[in-house]
Amino acid sequence: MPDSVEDTSTISLRICLEGHANALALNKDNNQIALAGRSLLKVYSINSNGFTESCNMRGKNQNLSYSANDVAWSTLDSNLLATAATNGVVSVWDLSKFGRQKQLLVYNEHERTAHTVTFHSSEPNILISGSQDGTIKCFDIRSDKSINTYFCNSESVRDVKFSPHTQNIFSAVSENGTVQLWDMRKWDKCMVQFTAHYGPVYTCDWHPTRNWLATGSRDKQIKVWNMDGRPGLEHTIHTIAVVGRVKWRPERTYHIASCALVVDYSVHVWDIRRPYIPFASFNEHTNVTTGIAWQGSDSHCLLSISKDSTIYKHAFKDATRPALKANAQGASLGRFGDISFANKIKEYEPKTSGASNTKSSSFIRRKTNVAGSIQFHLDHSKMYKFMVNDTFSGYPLSESVSRPTQEHESFIGCARELVISGKKLSELCEHNAEVSKKYGKHNATTLWNFIKLFYGSNHFEPPFEHRSSFSNQKNPMNSRRATQVASDWPQQRTELGQDLNGNTPETAHEIDVANVDDDTLGSSGVEHPPTSSVILSETQIISEITFDNFELLRNGFIYVGPTECPKALAFPALHHDVQAARPQLDLKASDHEKSPPPHVPTVLKVSHVPPIPMWEPHKFVSDALMLMNDVGDVQTALTVLIALGEARKLLPIDDALVEHWFYTYVDQLHRYELWNEACEVINRSWLRSVQQLNQHSTAMHTNCGECGRPMGGKVGWYCDKCKSMQSAKCCVCGLIVRGVYAWCQGCSHGGHIEHLQKYFAKHSKCPKCGHLCAYS
């Protein structure tokens, strides 16, 4: 029956329970449902407008035999129920009796928890159960003991199902990822055994019309196996969570329902021909769904129970269709710079000739429209690949190399060869300019040379540090310089006295100083340096000239002293770069004042001025870096910023933008698997958010090899459930592993990597459990 003619009388119903149920089962007439849980064992009648409680088998009993993991209803007798309890007890119930007599039989033969129980499809007295002890028991309710025991050679049997196609065949799935087929008459050995999943298999279900077996596992996959002859994988469905239950949809060959054990609370119906998105979803539950069942042959009614203590009767017409809300287009950027784009192909009817374009033909075309369930898997898409033209970038390597390879090689080459620390800035710029030139990045080469010219030979400090060096004479550096000048003052005084007596300096690069007032001599006749100034050497003067104090240099003289000085003496300045553009005055000796005013700051003539520009390049450099990022070269923009060191504080670039550059460049390095280079960039970052990237996703969660439980304790290899450290031992030699540990994600066993290399050179299965480990 197609989806377009669903039963519109079917509605969604909900009922709250006293406790959450672990399993559900329907009777042969599909008008009653049995619910079993840790504190729940009831039977409800299914009505058109809800559920009605008809039997409570637990009552006030607190026996663990009533704490059930699974429940099964006989397919031939509506009065017979079976439950599998957490203490390993398998109970048979007769609903036609009263009180305690309802518990017809109690089989206490399993040594550990019983996970599943099911009745034979054609024999009303036969049922089988699977347990954590790795055994399968076959019971005849006419006997008080099991009639057969099947040893699965695994740690736990999670589900068993009778085949609807062969009377004596049943399947069993285990926590070691294997699937077994057994003949009830041959208890000593299974017929077929194969590894279906790389993790525990929790559920299985036979297809009602085809010889297909569906399995669900912790690896978040649903697999459909063709059991005709040798088992073969037909379809695989990838889900987002661990699969807990699967049920084939009646009257729909390719539809199967599933629910998850964790994370995902919804019930999904999948079309195995389009496995990447559910055909329909039921999202009513607010906690993990623990059981699902179709109401007999009605493909539009689904029953589900959950840990939210509710039971739902879902109408298929109320299900959501994820495919209708999904984006039918997708795009991805490749590592070579190409772009892949996929979009849905719209189905258009072929154009017909004018003669045939009649009302009758259009009527026929409308009648042949396919149903929604059929159209779902017929949807298909087309993918396009867009390549970037060679003229897009200004970084060509050679005309013989294709554009994607150029960008790929230049990025990787620069990432590996660019140096961002460990040398002087001038050396870094020179090296990185050569690397950029080598890979044809001419704009980057120019930028590196510019950085070398303006930042490599000059020392830039924050503005407040520059101003304090001249305005605050109490600065420790200036105090040391004043002490040095005071110690050399007598010698300088003698030299200056000789110059003022008429001796002409031999060279034009010597220092001229104004006549010193007699007040600078103390009463004791001892000469002291001027208290209002500090005499600096030429080297010190040059090192002090920066952009912020450049205005202190006037006409070739640098003034050191109180800024409020009303008068300064001017002497003939020597020819240099700063005063070359100013007119020179020929001053005679008579024009000089014979005695300077008291407390006049010393005026020193600078013989050489460094080639510092009269403008600051910081804004220009920041604009250049932003432009490099805008054209897609975030590699150059960020490496320049890192190489600048403390000078980057002078650039007016927002930290949020720099953080975005870091994330972008690190992501690009990860795309090319340049892990070491990405780590170095992260370590050189001065932003806390970027520095913490190396601390993310460094933990590898493991499971116990004995019980399969995740290890989340404080001690690394100690299992809180098993109370042992068996997982820390090598499965080959049996000794505790110290150092490199090789671990199988499928069976959770491992050991010394050297021992496993030798073992798997000759074997293919795990030495401890027989799991088919994918060792490489």
Curated annotation (Swiss-Prot):
Region annotation (Disordered) ranges: 466-490
GO cellular component: autolysosome; autophagosome; cytoplasmic vesicle; cytosol; GATOR2 complex; lysosome; Seh1-associated complex; vacuolar membrane
Domain of life: Eukaryota
Coiled coil regions, renumbered to chain: none
Encoding gene (name): Wdr24
Annotated localization: Lysosome; Cytoplasmic vesicle, Autophagosome
Name of this protein: GATOR2 complex protein Wdr24
Residues involved in Zn(2+) 4 binding: H749, C766, C769
Classification of source organism: Eukaryota, Metazoa, Ecdysozoa, Arthropoda, Hexapoda
Positions of Zn(2+) 3 binding: C744, C747, H771, C773
Gene Ontology biological process terms in this record: autophagy; cell division; cellular response to amino acid starvation; lysosomal lumen acidification; positive regulation of cell growth; positive regulation of macroautophagy; positive regulation of TORC1 signaling; protein ubiquitination
Pathway: Protein modification; protein ubiquitination
GO molecular function: transferase activity; zinc ion binding
Job of this protein: An essential component of the GATOR subcomplex GATOR2 which functions as an activator of the amino acid-sensing branch of the mTORC1 signaling pathway. The two GATOR subcomplexes, GATOR1 and GATOR2, regulate the mTORC1 pathway in order to mediate metabolic homeostasis, female gametogenesis and the response to amino acid limitation and complete starvation. GATOR2 activates the mTORC1 signaling pathway through the inhibition of the GATOR1 subcomplex, controlling the switch to cell proliferation and growth under nutrient replete conditions and during female oocyte development.
UniProt subunit comment: Component of the GATOR complex consisting of mio, Nup44A/Seh1, Im11, Nplr3, Nplr2, Wdr24, Wdr59 and Sec13. Within the GATOR complex, probable component of the GATOR2 subcomplex which is likely composed of mio, Nup44A/Seh1, Wdr24, Wdr59 and Sec13. Interacts with Nup44A/Seh1. Interacts with mio. Interacts with Nplr3. The GATOR2 complex associates with unmet in the absence of S-adenosyl-L-methionine; the mio-Wdr24-Nup44A subcomplex is essential and sufficient for this interaction while Wdr59 and Sec13 are dispensable.
WD repeats: 63-103, 109-149, 152-192, 196-235, 238-280, 284-326
PROSITE patterns per record: WD_REPEATS_1, WD_REPEATS_2, WD_REPEATS_REGION
Pfam families cross-referenced by the UniProt entry: WD40
Gene disruption phenotype: No effect on viability. Decreased mTORC1 complex activity. Decreased body size and weight. Mutant females have small ovaries, reduced egg chamber growth and exhibit a 90% reduction in eggs laid per day. Activation of autophagy and accumulation of autolysosomes independent of nutritional status.
